[in-house]
């Protein structure tokens, strides 16, 4: 049995089995076994169910010890298994427990039966769930203590059962061999110790108990598997985590050097006395500065205004001075004063949580120039790290999915093999008794046997019919009697009539129209609403419910109740009708309409929308497959909420005054479970810094920061993995899948209506013509074809008119298509169908002129194209690669040059006339001009100048008269130049060619814009025309190839996702309608005009009381700017919730809402948190996965069409990309030649040694450490020490520079790294010497530190730093060309929107998000605003300021100094369009940036796997070979082969143990067990590159090259191979073992034949013989 590779059947575990295991252990200790390839079976893991291929469980095998069916555990791990009645596998160690209980012990068997019983696990699960529920409750009654003691007893009993059944530590399946048991034992032991101790009331000890919630994970095998998978992903993320920590550390150190102490600068009211006060530090009187009231505060601000002493920093108002005093903002938690706070600030920037506040604080205190620092951190660091983590998780998920599919496939093959062997075993016996059995068997017995075989083969696959057959016969009679109605002929006729109605296409069309109208009626709900509209909507609701009821009745009549309820959509419709009727009866219950009925109406529309059904089907399958992961995420959120509540709940109650001056509890706390759950949910949504500040105020940094980091890191890992899994599922979305019957009927109905309209129009047109009937038919037929070309074949295949016109046009006999044939044509995706493309529609996928290309081809190619590719005949497009389109861009001049003559009919007629020759020469001249490269460069330069001048037209333009005049003349010059260019191209190419090119159309539009802007300047009433000049920046798109490529790729990847976007829009419409039903008119509140705060509900209850207040003068009953009063406002509010900007204020208004015209009350409707949580999950997360998945699918499709190349780079960049890839994949650079001078050679050896590089890296790290230990309030002694440390490091780096200059000479400056080091040394020396002469004010001490710190990038240097860093940076470097192209496009978008913002929002009142730093007054400030919006942060505050359009909020007549513009009001509609459109466009571009980098990361393993070996690889191979073959014999001994393979460098490297792999290579061996160099090289090369024709060609080239390099190769004849030699060795071992066993048995026989001596004397001879035989036996045993 031990030699069997696959134990078959279920064998009881007996004493013989235990003896075999012991013998096997003894043999393993004395022998060397080759079991390296033995691996555990995926389908036989502990916790999984036994495959059904093993048959049904025989009696006596349930809950009894069995021999393990997995050879890996049976042979290697010495285990036995137990199956419970649910076939779940349990494994135990086949060793004695506590030295007394063997596997055959009755006590242990009884305990094992208890452990494996399903009820025992159910008991533990119920206990854990009960305990988890009790943990989240507050103010528990006293009797709960008895329940907790009972649960503790159950946990203790469970531990005892596991210890007795499994043992404590012996074996891999012992109690302590499972880490989950460690957790369970620790928590239980701790709880037993502290149960009666007074320490149990402390929060820390209560927190430990919450770990019990995690016990749910080991109770579910799926959850346990997900945790193991996530741990494996975490191991793969270690390199990325190390790189992220490196970037965080470096950026924090730079932040310390740039901003240390700057955030303490505040505006202080300067005393007006004569200066008699005692001065403190030369900046002001000490007592005056320390007074908080003397700081300057903005209106409504909590912290003092920050300022700076630099030119572009924030300025103080008149009467105030900027002084460094006080604490840092945000209660001192936001600063760069030491490394810890700087690290927290950088982590906040990396996660993009409330970054706009940190931007403003730094820019106010240090200057706007430092925005560059934040751009680099946010755009590159945060973007790259997010892409890196997503890429690694995606790769891990794909590998796990591939592994699971392979193991499942292997398991299925094993199951089928087992079934086949089972059938073969029984086939012989059945053949012998065939005649007898056939006579005895009855049909029932035959069916039973077949059912058994089918069950054995299929296992868990049960057919529905089988389950229905198991029902009693009475149920079938009852169903046939009550649910299948065939009463009378009249009823049958009624049945047929109803069937004709519901199957008619117009019926489905009518239903779709009714559903759309119903949704429109729901969307018309708003506040306030007139009585007439309310009654109309109520009547409409009743009508639609009646229509749905009639539909259900007709379908029940037509299909019978039995057939009706067999379809899931019909069950859904019946639920909708029942709920609608219930709503009519219970009109007071509003929740039925909002939460149930409204979503069902929207889902009902999805039945007729194939994209919606396909997406929902994919979503359903994905969620079923990922149910364990979703459950794990839910458990983690629950655990984190309970953990936080237990840890910080008391602190939030006791220290509430630390957060609020009035000692009122804040909204976001963890005092109870609901608030803790919502707080954790907010943290996982990316907003954690504000709640962290409050937590640190009440509980301290030591507890809050670790807890928040745990929630952020683990929670984001789970969510990102779930996100990757869902995106991978939606990446398989195909819009061309089979459509439903309802959708087909809808298409047929629409086609029928179109055809009727066309026929009516056709008759009207034909009557007006006075021609014969035949001529009329001939003229009408083409139009009919054109009209029919817009429909699908399925829409018209049943119509006789279509067949008649088709017969007339083709002249052949046609056969009408039946309904079944038509539907089969539709359902088959492989059959050619007509694509519904409108007549004359332009090809949107290609912005170039494809029509010109087709016309320039010869006539034969045209005919082929007509016959082979027509959009009306096939859905398969002829793919034109991106490179061909780009080549066309370069060759378009030839096409225009060769084709312009053919496009002019007049020119063709009078070509030889004098005017014709002049016209032709003029066109040739114009063509040469516009195709000249200098002309193109000139136009490109003018385009850049024309675009760049837009940035100068800010609010200060009226004060700069010269620049204003210059711009006015410049606009005219640009207009003339572009008009001249347009005229030249008209003459050169002709109107048709010009307007057939979309880029030329864009140029023409820009010319129109320029002309309109010039006209708008001439008259004041046309001033709005002058503001559209920002559109002329769009001309940049047509002038630069990189932007063309990116825009073309974006269109190709985005347009196919329009249907998915519409589905997402419908989901948002659903939530908006629900929001209107829930919150319309409830966000109004009564505001105290004096304080600007809301009145308490005890002072004002409703609107009438608010208006009756005596001091009410300005109508304080105000509505929130963001509300749900109508669907449009609901969309905007949901958009802010989706971007997590301003969503807190929206949620606060919803949570405080009481009713219409009622004053809001603090947290009156806490259950409304549910609405926003559901929206974030189902309205944001899942639609986001859908969109990104479809975009990735389109990206991959376009990439495949282009042969696997990147679609965001040009043809020229693709060549550069290949060169860059070769350069980056090269493992080492060619070193400089070693100097011949001995001294220089010695120095060269020193500086090129790896130890020297390690020393330099350590010095850089030590220098970084000196910055970490600094802080803002350090003593002068520390500053002096830091100065001398900087001097020391400068000297050491200078010495390094001198040594390398001596060693490398002029070659030193050929490396960019060396040039950087040299510049750092020069500037560091200058930075140390300049303060001695000009003072430290101009050269800050941190400058030298930052210069020296810049050398830390050597850690990322290939070959110098960690290899894992180089591997992780490689995708970024390879995708850099594409990323730069996309960045150019997003910069152009930012530029256009910045100009638009300057024209529309430059004078908006400064409040909320618009201030002295973030505004639209200048181009730079506008770009800063748009940078914030690009990162989806801060745009809600800007929009809030733009919403000020009423007299109460702004002054429309305000005089703005220096300009003629009046007022500071905004335009809400323009602001909404501005921000929403920009966010969508920038999001789309940024998503493609993520996709580019992630796809590049995923492609690197395949590129490395498929790449050929380079010359460096072979050079290193022979370098290692020379160490093992110093005599150049071209041979090595076979015993050295393993060491040689382990000494090679990757990719030829083979780690030990590698003997099995080397033997499998079957290498030829010569006499003396030697192996030739060429054989080893060819075998290793084949292992790396695989086996195909390309590899065989490369191997032949390697062999021929080796023969040329070694012409005197020693000839030899291989006598054997490594595989044969191993087989011989194994055979010899077996023979030797058998001989030794024979010798041992003979020796035992001789010993037994020696007679015993009865007397007490001993014969010395016999004693010697006996002892010699014993020694001989012992020696034989030793040899064995």
UniProtKB/Swiss-Prot annotation:
It is a multi-pass membrane protein. It is found in: Cell membrane. Not tissue specific but widely expressed. IV repeats lie at residues 1232-1530. InterPro entries: Ion_trans_dom (IPR005821), Na_channel_asu (IPR001696), Na_chnl_inactivation_gate (IPR044564), Na_trans_assoc_dom (IPR010526), VGCC_Ca_Na (IPR043203), Volt_channel_dom_sf (IPR027359). Residues 339-366, 673-699, 1127-1153, 1420-1443 dip into the membrane without crossing it. It catalyses: Na(+)(in) = Na(+)(out). II repeats lie at residues 487-756. One of its GO terms (cellular component) is plasma membrane. The keyword Hydrolase does not apply. Residues 138-141, 197-200, 260-338, 367, 522-530, 587-592, 655-672, 700, 953-960, 1020, 1080-1126, 1154-1166, 1272-1275, 1338-1340, 1402-1419, 1444-1467 are extracellular. Its main location: membrane. Residues 1-117, 168-178, 220-237, 408-505, 560-568, 609-625, 732-933, 990-997, 1040-1054, 1202-1249, 1305-1311, 1362-1376, 1504-1680 are cytoplasmic. The sequence contains 4 internal repeats, each with 5 hydrophobic segments (S1, S2, S3, S5, S6) and one positively charged segment (S4). Segments S4 are probably the voltage-sensors and are characterized by a series of positively charged amino acids at every third position. The sodium channel formed by SCN7A is probably a heterooligomeric complex consisting of the ion conducting pore forming alpha subunit SCN7A and regulatory beta subunits such as SCN3B. Interacts with ATP1A1; activates ATP1A1 and thereby indirectly signals to nearby neurons to regulate sodium homeostasis. This is Sodium channel protein type 7 subunit alpha. It comes from Rattus norvegicus (Rat). The lineage of its organism: Eukaryota, Metazoa, Chordata, Craniata, Vertebrata.
